[in-house]
């Protein structure tokens, strides 16, 4: 599943390509992709003739402000579009429209015939139209329950200490909990724990003050590094222009089972933690 760096990469692409994009037409090819009330008919009716404003991100959710063309300057809202890519969702930009591929789920056109296309092989991705009198978090439970962003002032060693105090579950499991920290998934949990020198199976409540500081620093550093490389592509993820993320080629441990550690040469091991494949160095993370 795309994590924070991948979703942020998509957000940047959408912000660049869809600035003042007038939604002249919408086609929904998969009813399953529309999660908001009323299904595709209500979704299309409410988005048509609006303009995409700013794109933001909350955890793994993409959030676009929508307004009427006449309200662009003052940015008077006419609703919000929220997107979750789930496992295999991504967007493609087409300057000139052409026949969609089999896995195309939703299409948006502007007046010039240019198109933004949502493609999702496994068809788990979701879109919501949120009316202007509602906050997205009032409609989408996943948004309402998110913890702080890793780059926010609310995320710090003191916050982690408070959240993890007395917890027996593994620190890897806690990092995957979106109610504790928004946007981190399997890839960057493994990478951050390696850089912090913490074994993924250690009980969350057993981390000392020094380890908590290291973990906070490694999380933000690893996430920033991945954003700088366009995220990670191991299967379906790509940016708006169809380019793959390149962080995977620089990963410390993720998907490097039985390869030498980039720091000490010990073979990277793979195990299951909280039901998820977990990569770690038994020497550096002892």
UniProtKB/Swiss-Prot annotation:
Any one GO biological process: base-excision repair
The reaction(s) this protein catalyses: Hydrolysis of DNA containing ring-opened 7-methylguanine residues, releasing 2,6-diamino-4-hydroxy-5-(N-methyl)formamidopyrimidine; 2'-deoxyribonucleotide-(2'-deoxyribose 5'-phosphate)-2'-deoxyribonucleotide-DNA = a 3'-end 2'-deoxyribonucleotide-(2,3-dehydro-2,3-deoxyribose 5'-phosphate)-DNA + a 5'-end 5'-phospho-2'-deoxyribonucleoside-DNA + H(+)
Positions of DNA binding: 103, 122, 167
Cofactor remark: Binds 1 zinc ion per subunit.
Annotated catalytic residues: 2-3, 60, 276
A Pfam family hit: H2TH
EC number: 3.2.2.23, 4.2.99.18
Chain positions of all zinc fingers (FPG-type): 252-286
Protein family: Belongs to the FPG family.
Protein name in UniProt: Formamidopyrimidine-DNA glycosylase
Organism listed in the record: Prochlorococcus marinus (strain MIT 9211)
């Amino acid at each position: 599943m795309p994590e924070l760096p991948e979703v942020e990469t998509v957000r940047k692409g959408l912000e660049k390509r869809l600035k003042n994009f007038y939604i002249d037409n919408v086609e929904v090819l998969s009813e399953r992709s529309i999660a908001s009330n009323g299904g595709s008919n209500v979704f299309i009716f409410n988005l048509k003739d609006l303009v995409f404003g700013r794109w933001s991100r909350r955890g793994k959710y993409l959030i676009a402000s929508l307004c009427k063309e006449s309200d662009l300057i003052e940015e008077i809202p006419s609703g919000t579009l929220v997107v979750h890519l789930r496992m295999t969702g991504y967007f493609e930009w087409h300057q000139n429209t052409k026949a969609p591929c089999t896995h195309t789920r939703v299409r948006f056109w502007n007046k010039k015939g240019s198109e933004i296309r949502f493609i999702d092989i496994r068809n788990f991705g979701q879109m919501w139209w949120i009316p202007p009198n509602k906050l997205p978090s009032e409609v989408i439970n996943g948004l309402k329950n998110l913890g702080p962003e890793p780059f926010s002032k609310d995320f710090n060693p003191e916050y982690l200490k408070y959240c993890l105090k007395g917890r027996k579950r593994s620190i890897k499991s806690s990092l995957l909990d979106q109610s504790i920290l928004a946007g981190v998934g399997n890839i960057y949990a493994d990478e951050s724990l390696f850089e912090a020198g913490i074994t993924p199976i250690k009980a969350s409540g057993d981390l000392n003050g020094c380890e908590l500081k290291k973990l906070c620093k490694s999380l933000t550093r690893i996430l920033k590094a991945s954003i700088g490389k366009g995220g990670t592509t191991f299967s379906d993820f790509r940016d708006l222009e169809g380019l793959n993320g390149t962080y995977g080629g620089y990963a410390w441990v993720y998907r490097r089972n039985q390869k030498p550690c980039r720091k000490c040469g010990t073979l990277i091991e793979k195990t299951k933690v909280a039901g998820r494949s977990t990569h770690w160095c038994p020497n550096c993370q002892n």
